[in-house]
A protein has these predicted regions:
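Conserved acetyl-CoA-binding loop-helix of GNAT-fold acetyltransferases
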Residues: 38-51, 69-73
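Conserved beta-hairpin
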Residues: 5-18
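Conserved GNAT acetyl-CoA-binding A-motif
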Residues: 51-63
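Short glycine/proline-centered loop/turn elements that form peptide/ligand docking sites
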Residues: 42, 46, 63-67, 83-90
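A short, internal acetyl-CoA/4′-phosphopantetheine-binding micro-motif in the GNAT/acyltransferase core
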Residues: 27-37, 60-61
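Conserved donor-binding loop and adjoining core beta-sheet/short helix segment
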Residues: 20-28
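Conserved acetyl-CoA-binding loop of GNAT-fold acetyltransferases
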Residues: 72-80
Length: 99
């Protein structure tokens, strides 16, 4: 999944606590360790890549209401819905553009 991606990490106490994978303008994923969620790490990672890009795109499962809410707070807009063929899960494609 992340083989051709740029990966940026967040470290705390000499341990990786989160990372984001970016393939051009597409966010492959943002991951934060369970014990560090809701501490602002995801926002820090997202802000870092927002500074590098004019626009960003991602897919998120429709059932992941927490992630959808996070991305909407960060300025992402739902563009369309689709189906992840690998999992059969319904998903949204979301887009963010630099203002």
């Amino acid at each position: 999944m992340l083989s051709q991606s740029e990966v940026y990490v967040f470290e705390a106490d000499k341990m990786i606590q989160g990372f984001v994978g970016l393939n051009d303008e597409y966010i492959e994923g943002i991951f934060v360790s369970d014990g560090m969620q809701s501490c602002g790490i995801g926002k820090l990672l997202l802000d870092y890549i927002k500074d590098k890009k004019e626009r960003l795109q991602l897919n998120v499962y429709q059932k992941n209401a927490r992630a959808i809410s996070f991305y909407q707070r960060e300025g992402f807009i739902i563009q369309c819905e689709g189906l992840d063929e690998a999992t059969g899960e319904k998903e949204y494609t979301m887009l963010w553009k630099q203002k």
